[in-house]
Amino acid sequence: MVQTPPTAAELGLMQGYPAPPDKRVTQENLLDPPNNRWAFQHMRELMATAEISRGNGPVHALPERRRDLSDLSFTAGDGTRRTVAEMLALSYADSLVVLHNGELIDEQYFNGMGPASQHQMMSVTKSFVGTLALQLASEGLIDEDALVIDYIPELVGSAWQDATVRHAIDMSTGIRFDEVYDFGEGDVARYGIASGFRPIPEGWSGPRNLEELLPQFLKEGNHGEMFHYVTPNTEVAGWIIARVTGKPVSQVISERIWSQLGMERDAYMIRDRIGMEMAGAGLNAAARDLARFGQLLLQDGEWHGQQVLAPEVGRASCRERV
């Protein structure tokens, strides 16, 4: 029997006024277990953020056909049989929302989270930014075959000097970057500090924002030859979106997606110290609203009779690229 992990409240995190020193969650320790049990539902209390407005339109309620999936079993990656309930407990999940044919089948919340909670989405953010880049390309606002530096001359001399926009979107750039999440002194640590996700350490002499960070990455290998998962590629895509629209990514998400789908809650993006938004990992949103976005892609960009995205964009977002 897998035990349900303790909640942030049961652990006493940020309880009391003020919370005891050993129960305080800060920007310095938010990633350290168990502090992330509290932090991932309270990111805007720890760092600068930008609002993603749902607008003033009505909520598009999800049709429901409820079924409890807790006892549904499957074979896990290690070959053991697990139930959905066991998987959720072992992964310290805060929520589960399942749609089938556009209907809400199951919805479960843990650790104090509920339908209105805005949760840190980490790299799910990339799906929104990539989709927007493809949509703007379909409208002729972005040329996927153009060089990145045609839009962002600040990146001349960097890894993106001779990379195309498509290389960045597809994460096929040849770049010297090690995506290892140790948050010590490596590339991801530098990215976390520059993006505003992590505080600036005492004595830090490195980049203090994304504008300073991105030009420092150098080329390694050839572009377009292989998939190389590099979060800064999505930061570049977000920068291009902001450059061609004249608006921050949060506003483009609001206008193009959030206000179009009848979302239940506003969302928000983490931003750095000069207002550049964390396009690679900065989204915080409610679980049902993430499900709505997924359904939009499955419906080839159509939502309640409105073509929110070009059909080819929805299809491309659900297709494996080789």
What residue ranges belong to the model's regions?
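Active-site helix/loop module of the DD-peptidase/beta-lactamase fold
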Residues: 138-180, 216, 244-281, 285
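N-terminal leader/targeting segments and the immediately adjacent pre-domain N-terminus
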Residues: 1-113, 142, 170, 174, ...
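Soluble non-cytosolic domains of exported or imported proteins
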Residues: 78, 93, 119, 123, ...
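Penicillin-binding protein/beta-lactamase superfamily catalytic region
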Residues: 205-208, 212-218, 225-227, 245, ...
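Extended ligand-binding groove/face enriched in aromatic
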Residues: 92, 120, 158-210, 214
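Non-transmembrane alpha-helical segments in soluble domains
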Residues: 85-88, 134, 149, 166-169, ...
